[in-house]
């Protein structure tokens, strides 16, 4: 397990788990996890292994957790185990690939079932190194499994974005083969780019790999050729055609093992063009020996619209003489039956499979190997453990695929000219630099080339180490887990009525600020005009004009800062809705419009009885909350509302018969404040009976005297039982009382520096600290001071003082 960094507060872990294709080429399959979303990338087989051992390590991961499976292209090492995953595991996710990939997938895997030893069919030409292996029972899946999986596959267009349950992914051209794509994946703000196999080199029919317009955080890229550098395309083509030409003139035969689809079509285009330019070769046949390639040629003829500009212009030309399909060959024929193939003279055969494990290419190799006039040209990447890889060592003998006890002398020449549509080091490094990720995970490469590529990349970005731009490179092995801590910023969108209120508020603030700016600019301009009317030299006038401009710029900068202060830090209250990692802040009434959520109103009601009268109850409520709004007060009902949230009602007739007040308290449970306020009201009502204040308010002095007790007069005891006055001390705090409390706070902060203005009856005050003087107007609650720091400090104290001095609920203003 590789850990990039220890998880910290506010971070989520991104996890990469390689089930195949890590430190190897073949059976590509990778799992990425983030925020409980799981994506599988490719599902291939290893071309050098047989049966279940050729599969990725599916038993090491719970495939039922996978939400989406994305297939980059149709090659067997990326797609051949897909039917097995979909039909023989607990995988329940959705599968996506491009239209062209799906069109070829059906034919390719049908041929795979028949031809390989895994299929075990009657037509299979087997290459089983183990004579005791039970090929008939080693089927990974059947044709029926293949067709059922085919029906479940969904397609995606290039440059289109699909969003499913919080996962967004977009397909981009990857080059490599027809239909190949790289996926740009977004999960909860994290951006991941999976290149699959890709090519940045232009060829005859495919578009080069695209660079996505958005920078990914994590790049998962191939490392097939490590730090190797490709020979230029034109030089490769010239070298290949020269070898073919010279071999044919000597009477030899050329075998070109290829994958049935992909590079085969590119090589056929090269040969078709070369034959058209050389009349001496036009009587020599070119064959492509693959029933699969023949079936899929119609797909290539159909999907010319996703090929490069040259192909698209040729196929869409308005002039019928120029319009042609480049895949309708003139000099190339297909071989339908190898048993009837007559190979007595020189010829060129493009045959599959490319790894020479079995099939037509292996049979022709064994047939032509003893003749030194013949040649085999290896045009693709050769995987470890295959005949193609062994052949590059130029062995003296090769083993027969049909009879493992028989060896065949090898005298034909072997040439390696790689037309594999994979990036070399320069192309890979250039692409990485363009997308500029901070984390790179290398896949699809043998251990040594991958290790060299990792070292080269770390050396290239060594100057960034220890900085925020540091680039980290990982090269995990199969079944290794890479964990990367991702720290993201959560941003919520304000929608609906709440957004309209905020826009209105911002417009008002901006409009006010613009007016202030214009006034200041006009004042400065007027001052400048007054100065210019005086007789002065041109030099002095220019200087003052420049000073005026600087003053305006300075004031504009200050005003800009004030705007920032005004527009930030404002608290918003609403319902935060989270869906697919998107956060939206709404008011309750907007939920139905912007979400699929339904809303209900829950109203609480409680009945209680107290031994007191209405006036005493009202007095206690006013002492706590200040103002209470009386809705009804007649012979039958008394009702009030506290802070527009708590409704209290009393049925007077029922209360008289019950010997106390029967009180009904109701409130809507739509926020925490309402529930807290209701708890406070109920607590006050229940405590009225036993409150010492209630005893004092309702007690009377005796009308007679007690001789044995010294008669004393208690002011509290003199309070009559008549209802307390409407305007009690707390509910109707006088302005002077509030000013006194605010002044006390300022006094505690500034001491003797606080002076009350003479003759203003405490309505104004000044604070002098050093050279800075602040003038305070208590009635308007304004502070005038040339020091912003001092002014902000005083305003903050006044703001807190107002909150402390004011009751919870204010009296309604009357006009």
UniProtKB/Swiss-Prot annotation:
Keywords: Endonuclease, Hydrolase, Metal-binding, mRNA processing, Nuclease, Nucleus, Zinc. It is found in: Nucleus. Zn(2+) 2 binds at residues 77-78, 197, 444. The active site is at 422 (proton donor). It holds the Pfam family Lactamase_B. GO terms for biological process: mRNA processing; sno(s)RNA 3'-end processing; snoRNA splicing; termination of RNA polymerase II transcription. Its EC number is 3.1.27.-. Residues 521-560 are annotated as: Disordered. InterPro entries: Beta_Casp (IPR022712), CPSF73-100_C (IPR021718), MBL (IPR050698), Metallo-B-lactamas (IPR001279), RibonucZ/Hydroxyglut_hydro (IPR036866), RMMBL (IPR011108). Zn(2+) 1 binds at residues 73, 75, 176, 197. It is an enzyme of class 3 (hydrolase). GO terms for molecular function: 5'-3' RNA exonuclease activity; metal ion binding; RNA binding; RNA endonuclease activity. GO terms for cellular component: mRNA cleavage and polyadenylation specificity factor complex. Component of the cleavage factor I (CF I) involved in pre-mRNA 3'-end processing. Belongs to the metallo-beta-lactamase superfamily. RNA-metabolizing metallo-beta-lactamase-like family. CPSF2/YSH1 subfamily. PANTHER family: CLEAVAGE AND POLYADENYLATION SPECIFICITY FACTOR FAMILY MEMBER, CLEAVAGE AND POLYADENYLATION SPECIFICITY FACTOR SUBUNIT 3. This is Endoribonuclease YSH1. It comes from Debaryomyces hansenii (strain ATCC 36239 / CBS 767 / BCRC 21394 / JCM 1990 / NBRC 0083 / IGC 2968) (Yeast).
